[in-house]
Amino acid sequence: MATNFLVHEKIWFDKFKYDDAERRFYEQMNGPVAGASRQENGASVILRDIARARENIQKSLAGTSGPGASSGPSGDHSELVVRIASLEVENQSLRGVVQELQQAISKLEARLNVLEKSSPGHRATAPQTQHVSPMRQVEPPAKKPATPAEDDEDDDIDLFGSDNEEEDKEAAQLREERLRQYAEKKAKKPALVAKSSILLDVKPWDDETDMAQLEACVRSIQLDGLVWGASKLVPVGYGIRKLQIQCVVEDDKVGTDLLEEEITKFEEHVQSVDIAAFNKI
């Protein structure tokens, strides 16, 4: 009775094996990739687990094929078939992953080979440059000092000496002629004479002084370089007027002191002389 009860009971006794196989599979999928050999070992372990599970299923099916087996439910067999199918699918996917890893490893190896070939150690050495020594500078041969005999011979031969002397004489004469002409031209040119315009104030003694006679006395002064100009009578005050007269003088010949001395000589009419304005021309 106890055996028949266990046969009809839906208990999966080998579930821990499938759990272990599934755990190892996901550990291999999520863990670090150590190489193609490690992946192949994991795949072989899964395959062995699947084969062992198949054997156990077959044994369990053979055990339930005895008397009373037909009365057992068919749901267990369908679940086992579905589970086996899923494991086969996972097996195929795992094989694809292993193949992709192998291809990636082969590509990495090819890349490493290319990098090793292109490294400086494998490069061809550059051709050595030849050392060229600098060229020695060739010094020109030193000239031998001329002997006194050769100097005498050179002095004796003068093909154009006479012509040079004649040209020097002509150039000297031409230079003297031009200097003489320049001196004559400069002598004929009138020299600039410095002149000044002076405005004088001649004051009488009083209002009874004859201003016409005073002006005549002033204009009677004749000096070399003196030219008298316009004049006028300017009232001073109290009926007294002063004579304001303009003159142009050459600075080298006539000075203001000389003019004052000459005008003040007329003591009867002139009291004083002042310079009202002085301008250079």
Curated annotation (Swiss-Prot):
Protein name in the entry: Elongation factor 1-delta
Modified residues (N6-succinyllysine): 117
Region of interest: Catalytic (GEF): 173-281
Disordered, as annotated region: 118-172
Top-rank lineage group of the source organism: Eukaryota
Residue numbers of N6-acetyllysine PTMs: 17, 107, 117
Source organism phylogeny: Eukaryota, Metazoa, Chordata, Craniata, Vertebrata
CDD domains (UniProt xref): EF1B
Modified residues (Phosphoserine): 37, 44, 60, 86, 106, 119, 133, 162
Family statement drawn from the similarity comment of this UniProt entry: Belongs to the EF-1-beta/EF-1-delta family.
SMART domains xrefs: EF-1_beta_acid, EF1_GNE
Name of the gene encoding the protein in the UniProt record: EEF1D
